[in-house]
Amino acid sequence: DTGTQGQAGLQEKDITLQVARRLREAIESRLGLRVVMTRDSDRTVRLDERAAIANNNKADLFISLHINSSVSETASGAVVYSLSLNDYGEETLSENRQSHTVPLLGGRTRNIEIVLWDLAQVTHVQDSALLAGFVDVELRRRINMNALTLQQAPFRVLVGANMPAVLVEMGFISNARQEEQLASLAFQDRVVQGLLQSVVTYRESLRDRWQTESSQRSNQPPAEEEP
């Protein structure tokens, strides 16, 4: 699966892998975090398997990199997505909100209190939207963003991830000028720096949240014993 392809022959699969490798290097060297790639070679990985790889490694974040395409040759700019559950009715969610197993690699499973595998992301929608917002802000400072910019959609690659997850369309390969940009190492570096900083900002926001919650708990008066 080569994904989308530009007029000059640039292929989505090649650019996304290049950016992913550079992002891994940046995160590991600057933040000291471990990055797990869903693929590190020219091979096809099914959408469900991508989420399973993240779940199997108990990842804290899931970032899915893509390149957009359009029938309009003038469409341009990056778009950031987080999961939308608008296509799932409240009845479906309530019926399936119970203990289920989440598939992992090698045919193994792990029991967790969430909805069905297809709706695993439901418990992380708010944090996914928070991360997507940070990605949008940081990319906007560095590259051209599409008018749609920050969006929510029920992407299959996101719904199975049992952690905050975002999908980033780095630009439109159907636009000849943007195809040239996407192949540029300078452009790729701006994308990497934007994603790196968004991870830093997201991590800091979680630290602030934990400190606030911890402070609130410590300031609560002790519960009185019943006579």
Where are these regions (language model features)?
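Active-site-proximal helix/loop segments of hydrolytic enzymes
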Residues: 7-227
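Short, surface-exposed beta-strand segments enriched in small/polar/acidic residues
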Residues: 1-7
